[in-house]
Every structure is written in structure tokens, then in C-alpha cells.
Amino acid sequence: MLLSLVVHTYSLRYWLPAAVMIGTAPAYLLSWSAWRLLSTVLPSNLYHTVDDCVYSAYQSMVLFFFENYTGVETVIYGDIPEKKENVVYLSNHQSTADWIIADMLAIRQNALGHVRYVLKDGLKWLPLYGWYFSQHGGVYVKRSANFDEKAMKKKLSSQTKLGTPMYLVIFPEGTRYNPELQKVINDSQAFAAKEGLAVLKHVLTPRMKASHVAIETMKEHLDAVYDITIAYEGKLTAAGQRHPAPTMPEFLCKECPRVHIHFNRLDVREIPVEPVFFRRWLHERFEIKDKKLVLGRIQCLLRHMSMCYKVSIRNTSRHMDCQRRHNRNMPLETLRKHRRNA
């Protein structure tokens, strides 16, 4: 009974951060609205400067819960530049917590307020946050044939003309990779095979349009492209089968003990501009991600096997110690009979 209560209480750990984050959102948006109204008679770049500062303060509070409160260990591979840069951030997508990983990296460059997102169009109806993300410089896009290239170019061009600092986060897969949604994975792999591209197993085939438009439109404004690969530990069975990545509540409950972030900085001048070559380039980056995730699975399995082996050795050692103590307390004649029978 007591154990069940403890387990249930622990599973509700996310209620505190959820209550704080949602509870403070109206006050944050109210203060932002007042500033937005006041800034209509001020230069546009001044609005973005103050907005970035206010957004950074709010996101720092959010990040505290995800990075400190949870106790999840963050392992970063690669060297993050110390100075702020204007970048496009490209990452694999498998969890509703993926956006917080961008915050974890941005804050290490003191660029948390500059984080903006390319989001699927349906998220603009998200209560409280949906409209604000657009005002903060984010871009809502529709998929495939409904993608509005002109609208995205116009939005990004207006930002760059003002000299707005840019940390634009894009998830090129367009939707989250979930090993339980086999139809989505099969369709993605079939499309890659049809286009003559390598078939990927642990990520989805990336869609190129939003990434290409962003890099092409802001090429003179950008310093680099950040190529990010995220792997959540603790989502493999002993047989090596992959479970879905943790949701935000699961992440806050530390159901993921460790998150691995592979950081790779790419010179924007080395990225091809022509759509055909850009598609190949982007797919090659996701091939590398696919291989990293395979290697990560192998390492996790080896770690799991090592832990099981250590437990087995420990249990065997305990058994032998018990046997020795038992033998020491046994009469000599009885011990000799046991050994002869053995």
C-alpha cells in the first residue's frame, strides 16, 4: 500500500512544473501584450530586443524544470561555440520534449531569447502559446502541396532586414518518429526508395522545403547550420526493441535517465543551394543520424548486458559467501560426507 502510494506520488512529479509553467503563462502574455501595444510607436527592432529578453526569462524558468528539477543527465557531444550565432538548427524529431533540447543548447550560448520555431500549421491554435510563437518570429507551415513558400520567405526576409538574431529550429521529418506507428515508417521508407534515396530505419525521410527556404532566404544573415542528433536513453528493451521516446510528462518524471545530444556545426557556405543537391545533402545528414542512433542502441544494449552481468556476479558472490559461512558452522564429519556425496 505504502509502496503504491510512493510510486503514484512520484508519477505525479510533473504536476508542479506543469502548474507553474501554465499558471505563469497568462501573466507573461499579459505583460508581453502591453509591450506589444506600446512598441507600435517604436522601432520594430526595439520590439524584438525587449521581446527576446522577456522570452528568455520565461524560458529560463521552463528550462529549470526540464534540466535541473528532473535530474535527467544531459550528455553533449561536440563543441558548442561560446559566442551567439545566427543559425538554422536541424534535428531529428521523436518526442514532444525535443523543443526543450534546443533551449538547452541555446542557453549555453546566451541565445535563449533568440530561439524561434518552424511549426506545423495546426499548432497555431494552441491555447496561449499559438499566436505568440508567430509574434516572436516563428513560422507556421503546411505540409507537401499546401506548403506556402512565399509566405515563409516573406516572414524570414522581414526578420533578417531588421537584423533580428535568429536561432531557427526546424524538424525536417515533419512529424515525430514513433516505432509503434509502423505505417508512417513504411510510407517514409517507400518514398525514399522511390526517390532513389537511402532507406532510413531510425529516423523518417526528411522533407526539404522548409529547411531549404530558411537557409536560402537567410544565407547572408546566417553564420552556421547546427546539425543535431538526439537520443533518449532508457527506451530499449533487453532484446533491443525500441519504445517511443518520452513525452514531456514522462521526461519530467525522469523516465528517461539520460539524453544524448550530438552537436555538429556546419559552415553555411558549404551547403548546396540548388534544390536537387540540397535534398541529397539533407538526406545524407539524416543517414548519419540514423547510423548514430544504431550505434547508440548497441552501446545501450552493451551497458544493459554489463549491468545484468554485474548483478549476476554479485548474486553468485553472495551465494558463495553464504555457502562458506554455512560450511564453517558445519561439523567436520558432516562436511566430509557432503563433499564425498558431491
Where in the sequence are the language-model features?
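Soluble catalytic domains of membrane acyltransferases
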Residues: F65-P246
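Catalytic lobes of large eukaryotic enzymes
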Residues: T164, I185-N315, H319-C322, H326-N327, ...
